[in-house]
Every structure is written in C-alpha cells, then in structure tokens.
Amino acid sequence: MLRFAVIGHKAVSTPDFSLNDMPGGAGRMDVLCRCINASFFLSHDLRRDTECFLILKGGEQADPANTVTLRFSGEKIKSLNPDERSAGALIKKALVTIPEEEYQRAAPGISIRKSGLAKLLEEHPFAVLDENGEDIRTAETLPENFILSDHQNFTEEEMELIKDLPKYSVGPRVLHADHTIIIILNEFDRRGEQA
C-alpha cells in the first residue's frame, strides 16, 4: 500500500466553504484536491492500493485544536471524478462528520479524525519529499509512505517532527505536490512494483 500525506497549512477544517472558491475561501483546498486526484486516477481506473491523507490545519488562523486528518482509501472510494470540484465535494461532505480521536467513516472510502501530523507519524514510517533528498530514480529501494507540503514550506514545528526521516527527491526542481505524487507513482509503475 502506497501512502501520501499532504499538509494543508491554510486549508479549512469545516464544511462551510464554497466549491466555487476553493483557492481562496477554503485555504488552497484546490491544491489538496489535485493531490487526491493524482494519488488515485489512471486513464480508465483508480489505483486501489493507494491511500492519501490530507492534514487540514483549520484555515488562516491555524489552530492545533481544529486540525483534522482525512484518509482517502483507493480500495473503497466512491463518487470520485477527475476534477477538483468532485474531490472538493467529497472533502466538504467528509467535514460534515464531527471528528473524534479515532477515524470514523465519513463517506465510502473516506475517514476523518481529529489529529495531525504527529499522530500519523506514529502509525506509518514516512519519508519526506525534499528537493535535497536522495533521487528516486537512483534509490535502490523506495519507501511506501511519503509526506508532502502544499504550496507552503513545512513549518518549524513540522520540520522538528520530520527532521530524522529519510528524504527523497523527484528531481532538481521544486514541483507542485500533485505533480510530485504522479512522478513517484510513475517510478513505482516503471519498477514494476504495485502502486
């Protein structure tokens, strides 16, 4: 199972956002929607052995008390279409569910809980995508879990949490998070490994 965790630094964690204003009023939710689509879509199918975690930090005034994690499972997800609005609608629907400490089903293939990066790192051995990391094309083996940031850099607190994790790069240039996910999945495909 491949896993991608994307931190949405300004992403709202309540359902009261407009699907017509995901870049602004929803805190760059559009970036996260593209990451969901990149994680799952093939030309005529979905990647069923992939999960995508979105860590929504609660909007402009990010507050750890408002941070939620959404887990999207390719094995069970329904009603996902290859456009940002479809992914945004699924996020909005999931956020109607009041999060608790453990994952709760919010929709088919989507779970929500009240937590952030620290708890996710306790559960899975993640690697960080960083332009200064080991190149995925020359790495002998690749990890199955990757952390990415949205359009912003990791915060100091996040850097402290991930400082000892292995770092990998998809190349010499900084790319959008969704493009990076596609390149990683392509590398797994080229190696003939399940993704």
UniProtKB/Swiss-Prot annotation:
The gene is trmY. GO terms for cellular component: cytoplasm. The keyword Cytoplasm applies. It is found in: Cytoplasm. Its main location: cytoplasm. The lineage of its organism: Archaea, Methanobacteriati, Methanobacteriota, Stenosarchaea group, Methanomicrobia. S-adenosyl-L-methionine binds at residue 129. Its EC number is 2.1.1.257. Signal peptide: none annotated. Disulfide bonds: none annotated. It comes from the Archaea. GO terms for molecular function: S-adenosylmethionine-dependent methyltransferase activity; tRNA methyltransferase activity. It catalyses: pseudouridine(54) in tRNA + S-adenosyl-L-methionine = N(1)-methylpseudouridine(54) in tRNA + S-adenosyl-L-homocysteine + H(+). Keywords: Cytoplasm, Methyltransferase, S-adenosyl-L-methionine, Transferase, tRNA processing. Homodimer. This is tRNA (pseudouridine(54)-N(1))-methyltransferase. Belongs to the methyltransferase superfamily. TrmY family. Specifically catalyzes the N1-methylation of pseudouridine at position 54 (Psi54) in tRNAs. One of its GO terms (biological process) is tRNA methylation.
